Amino acid sequence: MAFSASALSVKTLGALLLVAADLLSAQTAPTHGVRPRRLAIRGAMVVEGNATPAEGPKDIIIEGNRIVQIVSLDPAAIRNGTARRPPADVEIDASGKYVGPGLINLHGHVQDERAGLAQPLEYQFKLWLGMGITTVRDVSSETPKTLQLRARSLAGEVMAPRFYVYARYAYMPVPRNEAEARQRVRDLKAQGVDGLKLFGMDKDVYGPVLDEARKQGLRVAHHMAVDETNALDAAANGLTSLEHWYGVPDAAIPDGVQHFPSNFNYADEGMRFRLAGRLWREADPAKLQDVLKAMVKGGVAWNPTLDIYEASRDLQRAETQPWYGEYLHPTLEKFFRPDPSNHGSYFANWSSTDEAFWKENYRIWFGAVRDFERLGGVIGAGEDAGFIYQVYGFGLIRELELHQEAGFPTLKVLQHATANNALILGQQENLGRVRPGYLADLVILNGNPLEDLKVFYPPRADAAAGPGGGVAWTIKDGIPYDAQRLLREVRELVSTAKRSSSR
């Protein structure tokens, strides 16, 4: 059968158009780990990060490492091909996907070893990026190493989130008077840190440390111990953020100190955390409200890290998390086993009675956190992973679920991990929102996080809710990362490490 010239030309033209379309698609597809000159995220539903409702479809245009334009689109115009779309060199099709600010982890620890065993930083960083975490406030890791990582991350030399380095204040010798305390703050400032991390504090040096930090332009995170200082001292002296919950219920106990048994030893972590589960019940409700109001008035933000103590209320859940098989590195697995030499591994002889007290603890704690925000306080979100059965990245997503359990609307939960965390960092003009002029730190999700926060977790074929969800792309500083590729590489890394450790 002979073909006519006109038929042949039409078929040839059609084939050429298909080839051209394939070439165009190949030219505009993002390259993992490479920042394009101009990137478009097409047709996304956008959750801005400021607790306003999702809106879309929208095109988000990025030039270099900044968002430069966000265009609202008419769905009908998209369907009939008449929508005016801003041009770009590279495109990500986000149709049916949700885009939000990259998550900020306000309480992270860069860890290259656990339980005396080396642990690759690649494992930690890829988990963070793979679950949409683009910024980490590192609180008291090895400062010189973390400062180097901060610089390398900003330069795009390492596949990692951006870091804000909060150095440990109380390294040896610990300052014992005002002059030494102020000098320590100045010394840390000279190293180039972004802030300070405090553990416990004596009253006579607490005020001078926070005063000197303000003079040096340093923000301060405080993990309070059972010590002289509490949340009222933080409020009076202008602390930036109170970590965990230490110091809040303590300040509301009528007698000024928890009713410890006579044999209590604070250095015994099993005893310490067992009694911590009985603390919130001793706080006077009316006095607790006064403490929360004082924190709000003093401008103290609260980063509760609800996730890191959850094993205390349900140990079996913590020990059997479904992603452990593929994502738990052998070094972490060893560190998590009950062992008094490993901080937070205190679960020898943990009982149902301990869990019952901790469940009550959480109920009161949830209420205090909710009241704090309703009074005008700023709530942040951080994971403190690498301890107490929490794996990097997974810990922050669990933190968001616990904020939801505490009663916060999901829009507010996401605000805690984005715009609020940026505010606590002093980066509210650069981070935490999907907005023109802001840094291009974004997460593109295969699902609606307002319906189910579990879309941040890696997809699982055997999940009861089905295999959907997961982060499609994480964009940090304008660099797109294929999140599922990162997580696949983590699984391979863990599998290799397990084989090596079993030899």
Residue ranges of each PLM-predicted region?
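Active-site neighborhoods of metal-dependent hydrolases
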Residues: L188-D194, V248-A406, V494-R503
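N-terminal signal peptide c-region/cleavage motif recognized by signal peptidases
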Residues: A20-A21
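C-terminal cap of metal-dependent C-N hydrolases
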Residues: L439-V494
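Metal-associated gating/positioning segment near the N- to mid-region
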Residues: R84-D89, A94-E157, P173-A179, L232-G247, ...
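Active-site gating/metal-coordination segments in enzymes
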Residues: R168-Q216, F264-E282
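Histidine-rich, glycine-flanked metal-binding segment
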Residues: A29-R37, V46, N50-G100
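Divalent metal-dependent hydrolysis catalytic cores, especially in the metallo-beta-lactamase
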Residues: Q124-P144, A160-R168, K189-M201, L210, ...
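C-terminal helical cap
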Residues: A44, A348-F357, Y362, G367, ...
